């Protein structure tokens, strides 16, 4: 997907993207590739691949599930790495107020430089483990209308890291590749215990390649019990509802 094809794909979905926004994506790509030479940010570095598998993939919540995004919404991105999915969404939908939490300081340093270069406002970067970031005494707990994750962790693990951060009546949106059926089956108990309810598992295909993608949307129905999230490392080693 070339930058021009990226622009057309967004226009086909009803998003008119300005020259300034396209320039922001071009700068993002340049900085990602340059920094990646000495900080491991991504295995994907070819321009066409980055525009499809990072930039387009990251904005799919806005394209495929726009009903969950209102102007000025507070969004938290857990384990964003090189800024995915939240910063491409911020470029496309500038009114979002974005908080990114990541456990690796090198990535946060890159993101600080990137946010400055892109002249993005209302972006907060936090170096922390998700388990402590959302703990019972954290100021960030149950603060966000939307929490996203595009991580490789299973849904049962991601739910424990993300749902505690969601306000009641807010949404946790997980960006997943194919085969979510088993993950949803394994994660059902965790979602319920943490105060969530599965709303939809929306499947769609990426343009150009037709690769399958899913958006799993969970609504926060009640407060998360204080004992969650458990201490760092525990959710991954011993997921809620593990058989």
Swiss-Prot record:
InterPro entries per UniProt: rRNA_ssu_MeTfrase_G, SAM-dependent_MTases_sf
Residue positions binding S-adenosyl-L-methionine: 79, 84, 130-131, 150
One Pfam family named in its UniProt record: GidB
Keywords annotated in UniProt: Cytoplasm, Methyltransferase, rRNA processing, S-adenosyl-L-methionine, Transferase
Compartments reported by the entry: Cytoplasm
The UniProt record lists the keyword Plastid: no
EC number(s) given by UniProt: 2.1.1.-
Disordered: annotated segments: 219-243
Primary location: cytoplasm
GO cellular component: cytosol
MF terms (GO), sorted A to Z: rRNA (guanine-N7-)-methyltransferase activity
NCBIfam families: rsmG_gidB
Entry function: Specifically methylates the N7 position of a guanine in 16S rRNA.
Family recorded in the similarity comment: Belongs to the methyltransferase superfamily. RNA methyltransferase RsmG family.
Name listed for the protein in its UniProt record: Ribosomal RNA small subunit methyltransferase G
């Amino acid at each position: 997907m070339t930058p021009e094809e990226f622009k057309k794909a967004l226009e086909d979905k009803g998003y008119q993207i300005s020259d300034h926004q396209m320039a922001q994506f071009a700068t993002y790509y340049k900085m990602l590739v340059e920094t990646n030479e000495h900080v491991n940010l991504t295995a994907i570095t070819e321009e066409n691949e980055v525009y499809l598998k990072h930039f387009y993939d990251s904005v799919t919540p806005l394209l495929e599930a726009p009903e969950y995004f209102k102007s000025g919404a507070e969004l938290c991105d857990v384990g964003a790495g090189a800024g995915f999915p939240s910063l491409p969404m911020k470029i496309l939908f500038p009114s979002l107020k974005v908080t990114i939490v990541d456990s690796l300081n090198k990535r946060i340093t890159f993101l600080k430089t990137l946010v400055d270069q892109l002249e993005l406002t209302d972006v907060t970067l936090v170096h922390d483990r998700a388990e402590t970031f959302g703990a019972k005494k954290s100021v960030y707990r149950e603060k966000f209308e939307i929490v996203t994750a595009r991580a490789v962790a299973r849904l049962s693990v991601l739910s424990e890291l993300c749902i505690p951060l969601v306000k009641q009546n807010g949404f946790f949106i997980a960006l997943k590749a194919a085969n979510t059926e088993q993950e949803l089956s394994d994660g059902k108990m965790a979602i319920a215990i943490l105060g969530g309810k599965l709303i939809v598992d929306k499947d769609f295909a990426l343009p150009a390649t037709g690769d399958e993608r899913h958006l799993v949307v969970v609504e926060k129905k009640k407060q998360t019990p204080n004992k969650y999230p458990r201490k760092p490392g525990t959710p991954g080693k011993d997921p809620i509802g593990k058989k």
